[in-house]
Regions:
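Cyclic nucleotide-binding regulatory module and flanking cytosolic helices
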Residues: 2-50, 94-95, 99-100
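Short N-terminal helix-initiation segments at or just after the protein's N-terminus
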Residues: 1-17, 35-36, 52-62, 88, ...
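A structural signal for well-ordered alpha-helical scaffolds and beta->alpha junctions
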Residues: 14, 28-32, 123, 137, ...
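Cyclic-nucleotide recognition modules
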Residues: 86-145, 149
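Polybasic "coupling" helices that flank or enter modular domains
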Residues: 131-188
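Cyclic nucleotide-binding regulatory domains
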Residues: 52-114
Length: 188
C-alpha cells in the first residue's frame, strides 16, 4: 500500500480553502529474488481462498507472513461494527512482524481478498534471519517503515483535519460541477 497526495479545493464563505488528504491504494511491494529464494528455505506455504479471514484479534502468531501472490486486507472492527482498514497488502509484503517481535497476539483481522499464497516463517527462523541475514533484516525494516508512514498519515489526517473539514471534502468530491445554477447548491 502506498499513499498518494490529493488536494481538494472548495469555497467556504467566499474564502478559497485548499485542503489536503491522503488516500490509500494497493500496489505490489518491490520484489527481491534473493529474498524470495531465502524465504523458500524457511517455513511453510499456505494458500487461502478469496474472502477467507485467517487471523483474528487475540490470535498468537507462530511466524511472520510473506505474501508470495495475492492480496490481503488488515482491519479492525469497532464496538459499533465500524470497520477500519489499516492497509491492503499484495505480493512481496511482510505482515505480522510487530506482534511476532513483541510476542503479543494480533489486534487485527487479516483476510485474503483474492486467492492468496503466503509463506509463514516460524518465530525461531525469523529471529535467526534478523540476526544473521542483512537482506532479510533490511526487508523487514523496510516493511516496518512503510507501515509506520501509513500510521503517521492516519494520525496526521485525524489530528489536522477536523470532522467538519473531512465532511466538506467528501461533499466537494461528490458535487456535480457540470450543472451550476447561480446562488444555488450543487447537486450531489
Amino acid at each position: 500500500m502506498l499513499w498518494a497526495h490529493v488536494s481538494l479545493g472548495f469555497q467556504d464563505n467566499n474564502v478559497n480553502l485548499l485542503k489536503s488528504s491522503y488516500t490509500s491504494f494497493t500496489l505490489p511491494n518491490k520484489r527481491n529474488a534473493v529474498l524470495e529464494r531465502l524465504i523458500e528455505c524457511h517455513g511453510e506455504t499456505c494458500v487461502y481462498p478469496a474472502r477467507k479471514i485467517f487471523l483474528t484479534p487475540g490470535q498468537t502468531l507462530q511466524g511472520v507472513y510473506y505474501i508470495i501472490t495475492g492480496r490481503t486486507r488488515h482491519y479492525m472492527i469497532g464496538t459499533d461494527g465500524t470497520e477500519k482498514i489499516l492497509y491492503t497488502l499484495s505480493d512481496g509484503w511482510f505482515y505480522g512482524e510487530t506482534p511476532l517481535s513483541l510476542r503479543e497476539s494480533t489486534g487485527l483481522f487479516s483476510q485474503a481478498e483474492v486467492e492468496t499464497r503466503v509463506r509463514i516463517i516460524p518465530y525461531q527462523d525469523y529471529e535467526i534471519l534478523l540476526d544473521t541475514n542483512k537482506v532479510f533484516r533490511e526487508a523487514i525494516l523496510e516493511s516496518y517503515s512503510k507501515k509506520m508512514l501509513i500510521m503517521r498519515h492516519e494520525i496526521e489526517s485525524l489530528a489536522f483535519n477536523s470532522c467538519k473539514d473531512r465532511l466538506k471534502r467528501l461533499f466537494c468530491s461528490t458535487a456535480d460541477t457540470s450543472y451550476l445554477l447561480e446562488n444555488k447548491w450543487y447537486n450531489l
